[in-house]
Amino acid sequence: MATILSIETSCDETAVAIVKNRNIYSNIVASQIDLHQTYGGVVPEVASRQHLETINPCLEQAFIEANLNWSDIDGIAATVAPGLIGALMVGVSAAKTLSILYQKPFIGVHHLEGHIYASYLSEPDLQPPFLCLLVSGGHTSLIYVKDCGIYEMLGSTRDDAAGEAFDKVARLLQLSYPGGPIIDRMAQTGNPHAFSLPEGRVSLPEGGYHPYDSSFSGLKTAVLRLVQKLEQDHLSLPVHDLAASFQETVARSLTKKTITCALDYNLTTIAVGGGVGANSALRKHLTSAATEHNLKVFFPPLKLCTDNAAMIGCAAADHFNRGHFSPLSIGVQSRLPITEVMKLYQ
């Protein structure tokens, strides 16, 4: 039963947590949203500098909230890939320093594996095998979860990730950053059937469409053309209806692919991870479809959908219990397929 101090700095949240297997003792998140809103997206250098300023206060607060000290910690973990290089380096450098100082083993964690483990934190009885729909700002993936560190990629996006599409469409609608929660909020008072938008489908060379891969560039372009047409006609933007129609199309597309994949692979359980997992339309459509097909579907609580260190600690605890440790020589990586997770361990 390992107690892990974990650090997550892969993008624009400085996060520190203390977890014991699947129990959260503390989960501190310092968001940088306000800093990046001015730029309409994450600025890597700004993110790195802010991580440097907030990492120590977050570490202190994590111990205070958990009411623990260093003698209670068995291992130290940090996200090592994928992510922004400068941002990752802040968290990993802090974790390695603490590992040496307090003589604790270091566990490097794959960010996407962390999102998978967010479901374990809210569903203690969840066990592989299951299908994970991982939808975030940088990824849209259908992952066959076979065991700790053992994954098969069944579907992915060919262009924009779902979260990225939300941000881009939000800009088209003259909304702020981050786009996901703002579009969701606007959609609550909009008509999801006001506009017919194309679902993202990926053509195969031999004909037909890939059953599990996604594409959101065409959907984004369709919204752009609608906006341009309305502006040319000097009409006001029906922002709420556009937001609802866009969100409905994304949710419907992801639901179809996820259910098809689960049925094709005889997987009876679906877990959802990533920030887009907080989207109300996706939760509604996927829950309804799963019930119709006698499948179980698990969504983490909203606070565990977005980046946090508790999910990193949960993944690290599982690796710790299996004797998987990372050398201090390990570096950070901007990209690393989740199928190569075990390369992080000796």
Curated annotation (Swiss-Prot):
Fe cation binds at residues 111, 115, 307. Keywords: Acyltransferase, Cytoplasm, Iron, Metal-binding, Transferase, tRNA processing. It is found in: Cytoplasm. Binds 1 Fe(2+) ion per subunit. Its EC number is 2.3.1.234. GO terms for biological process: tRNA threonylcarbamoyladenosine modification. One of its GO terms (cellular component) is cytoplasm. It catalyses: L-threonylcarbamoyladenylate + adenosine(37) in tRNA = N(6)-L-threonylcarbamoyladenosine(37) in tRNA + AMP + H(+). InterPro entries: ATPase_NBD (IPR043129), Gcp-like_dom (IPR000905), KAE1/TsaD (IPR017861), Peptidase_M22_CS (IPR017860), TsaD (IPR022450). Its cofactor is Fe(2+). GO terms for molecular function: iron ion binding; N(6)-L-threonylcarbamoyladenine synthase activity. Substrate binds at residues 134-138, 167, 180, 184, 279. It is an enzyme of class 2 (transferase). Pfam families: TsaD. CDD domains: ASKHA_NBD_TsaD_bac. The keyword Iron applies. Its main location: cytoplasm. Required for the formation of a threonylcarbamoyl group on adenosine at position 37 (t(6)A37) in tRNAs that read codons beginning with adenine. Is involved in the transfer of the threonylcarbamoyl moiety of threonylcarbamoyl-AMP (TC-AMP) to the N6 group of A37, together with TsaE and TsaB. TsaD likely plays a direct catalytic role in this reaction. PANTHER family: TRNA N6-ADENOSINE THREONYLCARBAMOYLTRANSFERASE (PTHR11735), TRNA N6-ADENOSINE THREONYLCARBAMOYLTRANSFERASE, MITOCHONDRIAL (PTHR11735:SF6). Belongs to the KAE1 / TsaD family. HAMAP family: TsaD (MF_01445). This is tRNA N6-adenosine threonylcarbamoyltransferase. It comes from Gloeothece citriformis (strain PCC 7424) (Cyanothece sp. (strain PCC 7424)).
